[in-house]
């Protein structure tokens, strides 16, 4: 399979007494099926549990779901769910990292002012790293803030690379690093990173969206069109996909 979607399938019939045990079992089964070799800290990062509270975990997942819609309403909704998770479990590192990243998106897209989000962002990212200095999501959140708000290219690249070093199998880190590299006119490296993101997560809408941007910016219009078409196939109602397609073709 060069660019398809069916990599692995299996049926699981389990009593959902402990969703986290089932999650670990499925994760390891996928790793084995795809012949991914997880070593030391990478394996620990993949399997680490940051909460044993299913309700808190559900709030976090809802935050991730809405964040990944990449819409103004989605980012604001994500912020609410991450905050709810923190209120229920103040030691939940992932929720702080999610909050920090959602704040960055809300500010970058004009939903909240930069001045308004900075104290909350600093508090959230500081707490996330205090709870786990090797939290991949926290380093991604830092990188995004340095990139989009501080324009501190050196710090942004350092944090993206740190996230990938901590977990080379994190699709999000690769595709976001690819976008950063494209902004610095390092297109060959950028394309390598987004291709890695596809290998890890062929269904990632955001990776396809960013790949379309990278290819378009490098004047590779056929490849840009192909990536956006794949995005639209995955999510036919995607407004972002339609807008990016129109932008590529000057509509």
Question: Positions of the model-derived regions?
Answer:
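Acidic, proline/glycine-rich low-complexity intrinsically disordered segments
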Residues: 1-251
């Amino acid at each position: 399979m060069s660019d398809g979607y069916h990599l692995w399938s299996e049926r699981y019939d389990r009593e959902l007494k402990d969703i986290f045990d089932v999650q670990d079992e499925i994760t390891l089964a996928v790793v084995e099926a795809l012949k991914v070799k997880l070593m030391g800290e990478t394996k620990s990062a993949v399997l680490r549990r940051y909460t044993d509270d299913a309700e808190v975990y559900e709030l976090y997942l809802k935050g991730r779901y809405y964040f990944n819609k990449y819409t103004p309403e989605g980012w604001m909704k994500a912020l609410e769910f991450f905050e709810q998770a923190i209120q229920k479990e103040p030691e939940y590192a992932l929720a702080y990292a999610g909050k920090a990243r959602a704040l960055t998106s809300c500010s970058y897209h004009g939903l909240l002012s930069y001045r308004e989000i900075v104290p909350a962002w600093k508090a959230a990212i500081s707490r996330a790293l205090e709870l786990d200095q090797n939290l991949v999501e926290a380093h991604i959140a830092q990188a995004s803030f340095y990139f989009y708000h501080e324009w501190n290219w050196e710090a942004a690249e350092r944090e993206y690379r740190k996230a990938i070093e901590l977990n080379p199998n994190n699709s999000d880190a690769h595709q976001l690093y690819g976008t950063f590299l494209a902004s610095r006119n390092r297109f060959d490296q950028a394309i390598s990173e987004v291709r890695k993101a596809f290998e890890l997560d062929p269904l990632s809408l955001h990776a396809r969206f960013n790949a379309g941007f990278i290819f378009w910016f490098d004047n590779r219009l056929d490849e840009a069109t192909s990536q956006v078409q794949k995005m639209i196939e995955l999510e036919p109602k995607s407004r972002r996909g339609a807008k990016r397609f129109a932008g590529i073709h000057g509509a």
